[in-house]
Amino acid sequence: MQCALYDAGRCRSCQWITQSVNEQLSAKTADLHRLLAGLPVEQWCAPISGPEQHFRNKAKMVVSGSVEKPLFGMLHRDGTPVDLCACPLYPASFAPVFSTLKPFIARAGLTPYNVARKRGELKYLLLTESQFDGGMMLRFVLRSETKLTQLRAALPWLRAQLPQLRVITANIQPVHMAIMEGETEIYLTDQQALAERFNDVPLWIRPQSFFQTNPTVASRLYATARDWVGQLPVRHMWDLFCGVGGFGLHCATPQMQLTGIEIAPEAIACAKQSAAELGLTRLHFQALDSTQFAIAQGETPDLVLVNPPRRGIGKPLCDYLAQMAPRFIIYSSCNAQTMAQDIRHLPNYRIQRVQLFDMFPHTAHYEVLTLLRRSI
């Protein structure tokens, strides 16, 4: 992938950009083999990759510069701003949004936040696009509610220019730290969720719910999990760390009893909306801590699917799963190192299948899906 920002030395986020996609896949596969060394694997499935550019459905832009000439991108450690509007990871549909937002910021009087001076209001712009219908969600991350009236007054102009903006919010993040968002979300549109669809499964994206940033590869990840579960004798399943329900909604059947657990209420609201659309009455989602939920249960499902954050599921949940002993575990991980550690805490399970998904091209990161079967 060619990138003028990288060539000019202005951005180094894509550290592997000089390598071909095949070289990147080989290096990631070797890393996964190294991390799982000593753990017998019955089947290594071929890695899955997608487009090498224009694949991201989300932009997280630091806003700097002045209200008349804002910059969208990032700040180097020395505070130097870099405009990333031309980043080739973003789809072409983002460019007109960025170019329209720059004069809008002046029109609304949203002074960019100055980190050194601790002054200004607009900290970040968070833009998400649906691959289903091209609808977009835009979040203005503000230091306070001071400019909220001005923002509301200017919105009709913005929505006339960019009708694809279906969901618009103001997120209030008052802390002088590099934190992307605060707890308070103020909706500026009637619509509060963005419609998405993977493999004919309806999904919803709300402002504070996690959603994969590479929809092409994510849709194949969910489809693969569905295929694996479909080959197993599963009538009762848990989906832990379920997010908006992508895995559970793909794997569920009308006959299956499935419980999805996620600590973020916004994500659970999305999952419940999707389940209602699909008419799956035996599928239940709850906003709880996944580990606490599992430990409190007195029943054992046939399969437990876990999709934890980078820290992994941790030893307490591993110990409980080992004690509870479901017949199958599917582990989806964005950090193979912690996944490998967790699997080693499950001595009574054997790895039946492993598949790498190149969710993050041009970086060392990848997603991995692993099927574990109880051996005793």
Swiss-Prot record:
Keywords, comma-separated and alphabetical: 4Fe-4S, Iron, Iron-sulfur, Metal-binding, Methyltransferase, rRNA processing, S-adenosyl-L-methionine, Transferase
Matches recorded under InterPro entries: 23SrRNA_MeTrfase_RlmC, MeTrfase_TrmA_AS, MeTrfase_TrmA_CS, SAM-dependent_MTases_sf, U5_MeTrfase_fam
Superkingdom of the organism of origin: Bacteria
Binding site for [4Fe-4S] cluster: C3, C11, C14, C87
Chain positions recorded as S-adenosyl-L-methionine binding sites: Q212, F241, E262, N307
EC number(s) recorded for this UniProt protein: 2.1.1.189
An example Gene Ontology biological process: rRNA base methylation
A GO molecular-function descriptor: rRNA (uridine-C5-)-methyltransferase activity
Catalytic residue list: C334 (nucleophile)
A Pfam family the protein falls into: tRNA_U5-meth_tr
Reactions performed catalytically: uridine(747) in 23S rRNA + S-adenosyl-L-methionine = 5-methyluridine(747) in 23S rRNA + S-adenosyl-L-homocysteine + H(+)
Top EC class of this enzyme: transferase
Family: Belongs to the class I-like SAM-binding methyltransferase superfamily. RNA M5U methyltransferase family. RlmC subfamily.
Its job: Catalyzes the formation of 5-methyl-uridine at position 747 (m5U747) in 23S rRNA.
Record's protein name: 23S rRNA (uracil(747)-C(5))-methyltransferase RlmC
Organism of provenance: Salmonella newport (strain SL254)
Lineage: Bacteria, Pseudomonadati, Pseudomonadota, Gammaproteobacteria, Enterobacterales
Gene name per UniProt: rlmC
